[in-house]
Regions:
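Glycine-rich phosphate-binding loops of nucleotide-dependent enzymes
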Residues: 2-236
């Protein structure tokens, strides 16, 4: 089976500083794949290279069988590879509806109204605040809005970059329940997280990134079963 996302030998960084050192990673259709690692491991750099925000220095990125290694980020979005960035990045002076509608600017524009309604079904709280400015919402509500905006583009693969960052334990529980629900509906998810325990509970497979290299790839159960791996890379 050809992976939905197939990353091979990816290298990248900033200026003269190499961050990614030959990363191999794949996500199959309908999978949740957890990408774990500490701050500075290279997780966000990998996301940005895959999504075309910071071009890769070397290696390849194939999505749906198409080489997108050097593609413009707009073409990557049109292909259905959508990232919800770390820190939510909502537009604070725009309303909830306006933020959502921007999510379909490049892809699925003709189904904007239907997709707004779909997001409101998933996140009823957003319907209640449809005319509210995003900057006046709580952190949890902004995270709902950021994910909803990503869903507006009808992604084939949704990359969630540190979605639990700054949320209360209760909201983190709600978030991971939502991710599982999206997966049950058939959406492939690349979950980039420092919340190791809950990520491994819902993931089909996991990667551990350290200093820009993959130190582990496999089943969550295998990662948790190895005392050495857990201590060295997860702090468990």
């Amino acid at each position: 089976m050809t992976p939905l996302l197939d990353v091979r030998g990816l290298r990248g960084g900033y200026g003269r500083v190499e961050v990614l050192r030959g990363v191999d990673l794949c996500v199959n259709r309908g999978e949740i794949v957890a990408l774990l690692g500490s701050n500075g491991a290279g997780k966000s750099t990998l996301n940005n290279a895959v999504c075309g925000i910071n071009p890769a220095w070397g290696g390849t990125v194939h999505f749906n069988g198409v080489d997108l290694t050097r593609a413009h980020y707009r073409l990557i979005v049109k292909a259905g590879l959508i990232q919800v960035p770390e820190g939510r990045k909502v537009f604070p002076n725009l309303t909830v509806r306006e933020n959502l509608e921007l999510g379909s600017f490049t892809r699925a524009r003709e189904r904007r109204a239907q997709n707004v309604e779909r997001v409101f079904v998933i996140f009823p709280r957003l319907r209640e605040r449809v005319a509210q400015r995003a900057g006046l919402m709580s952190g949890g509500e902004q995270q709902m809005l950021a994910i909803g905006r990503g869903l507006m583009a009808e992604p084939e693969l949704l990359i969630l970059d540190e979605p639990s960052l700054g949320l209360s334990p209760r909201l983190v529980e709600e978030l991971f329940t939502l991710i599982r629900r999206l997966h049950d509906d058939g959406l492939a998810v690349l979950l980039v997280e420092q919340n190791v325990g809950q990520s491994l509970e819902i993931a089909d497979r996991a990667y551990v990134l350290e200093n820009g290299s993959v130190r582990f790839s496999g089943l969550p159960a295998d990662l948790l079963a190895s005392d050495g791996l857990r201590r060295a890379y997860l702090g468990l």
